[in-house]
């Protein structure tokens, strides 16, 4: 009878160990893949991330928004010319240089909205270069590798049935939460790029207002917002680097449950800090 009970116990332990290892493998693979994809996605420019979407946004901006920007620019140019005339006592004290000043300002404004996409893409080219350099410096691996899982399996095989059942239930819960976390990370990273596309689609309007003294803050704030979105990628890379250091500090061979929940906590911390990167970048660059 004792032999039969022992065989049943060993069989249950084998099933639980196998189930735990499957849960852990799926859990860490999901997070490893998602975190590993962050550096790849963040390091791309809007034109290379989703070329089809970028071309659509560019066509919409040039065919729909650009004419509106042209109307706004025409209104501003006429308004500034009137203001210049009034400021010189209705041409009573006429000086020709202010006409050349007006022509120069209008020419610069026209060039700005004509080269809107070149300017906006230059911002993201600069930020991409910064992100790629940061990726070269941040060498820490965020992955939980196969040897770590093998060590965990050896530890699990030496445990009692009750402990294995507890770990199995907790690993199932952590697996579900990790999938949710991976989805959140995916939304944050891809949401940033969607926000970039939305900002770029309206680019001609703030560029049309850039040269006007009274309304120039709109154009300046827009440019700061573009740089904030670009350098948000750098802050995301910093978060991933911190996550890599924290993950490597976890020892899975001693207390598996504590280590498992610690990884869970670090992953939640990563998602939270990724949420904050946009606000931090805008705060530093004083963008609204």
Describe the function of each predicted region.
Residues 1-72, 87-97, 107-177, 216-221, ...:
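Gly/Ser-rich, low-complexity
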Residues 67-79, 196-199:
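Hydrophobic alpha-helical transmembrane segments
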Residues 75, 120, 127, 184-187, ...:
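Membrane-embedded alpha-helices of multi-pass transport/permease systems
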Residues 102-105:
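Elongated alpha-helical scaffolds
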